[in-house]
From Swiss-Prot:
Interacts with CFAP45. Interacts with DYNC1H1. This is Axonemal dynein light intermediate polypeptide 1. Pfam families: Ax_dynein_light. Involved in sperm flagellum assembly. The gene is Dnali1. One of its GO terms (biological process) is sperm flagellum assembly. Residues 176-255 form a coiled coil. One of its GO terms (molecular function) is dynein heavy chain binding.
Amino acid sequence: MIPPADSLLKYDTPVLVSRNTEKRSPKARPLKVTVQQPGPSGAGPQPPKAKLPSTSCVPDPTKQAEEILNAILPPREWVEDTQLWIQQVSSTPSTRMDVVHLQEQLDLKLQQRQARETGICPVRRELYSQCFDELIREVTINCAERGLLLLRVRDEIRMTIAAYQTLYESSVAFGMRKALQAEQGKSDMERKITELETEKRDLERQVNEQKAKCEATEKRESERRQVEEKKHNEEIQFLKRTNQQLKAQLEGIIAPKK
C-alpha cells in the first residue's frame, strides 16, 4: 500500500476497496482527490461499513455527519498493483490537545518546508489550506451547519485567490506584450535613427561638394571677370590713344588751311 500523503487534515486508516482494478501505470499513481456528492442511493465508492438493522426512521447522526464530511472533504483514492485504496476523512471528534497538536504541526511544517513568512508563498498557502480543512472537519463533526458555513468561507477565499491569480497572470502577459512591443518599437526607432544619420551624412557630403563647386565657380568667374576687365581697359586705352592720334592728325590737316 502506498503510504498516505502527509497532511494536516486528519484521515482514517486506508481501506482496500477492490483487488481487480485495471492497472493504469507501471507504478502507483499519486494520490488523487475525487469529488463525490452524496446521493439518496449512496452512489460512489464507499468503504465497507458494518450495517446495523434500522430500529427507527430517524437518520443516524454519525452516518449523516460522515456523509457531510465526505461531501465537504471528499475521500482520496489511489491505485497500486491493480488494487484500489480509499481513505476517508476522519469523523473522530477532536479534543483541545488535538487542536494544540495541530498548531504545533503547522508551525513545524512551515519551518521544515521553509515557507516564507511574508509575501506570496505556495508552500505556506498549501499548509494553511490543510489546516483550515482540518478546522472545518473538527467544526463539522460538532455542528454541521457551522461546518457548511466555513466551507462557504473557504470556497469564497479560494475563488478570490483564483481570481487574483488570473488577474495577475493576465497583467503579466499584458506587461510582457507591452514590453515586447516597446522593444520592437525601440528597434524600429534605432534603425530609423541609423538611416536618418546615414542620410544626414550623405546630405552633408553633397552640401560640401556643392560648396566646393560654388567656390570654384566663383573663383573661376572672378578670374574671368578680371581678365575681361583688363582686356576692356586695354581696349579703352587703345581707343583713347587712337582717338588722340586721329584728333591730332585732323587738327594738323585743318590748321594750314587757315
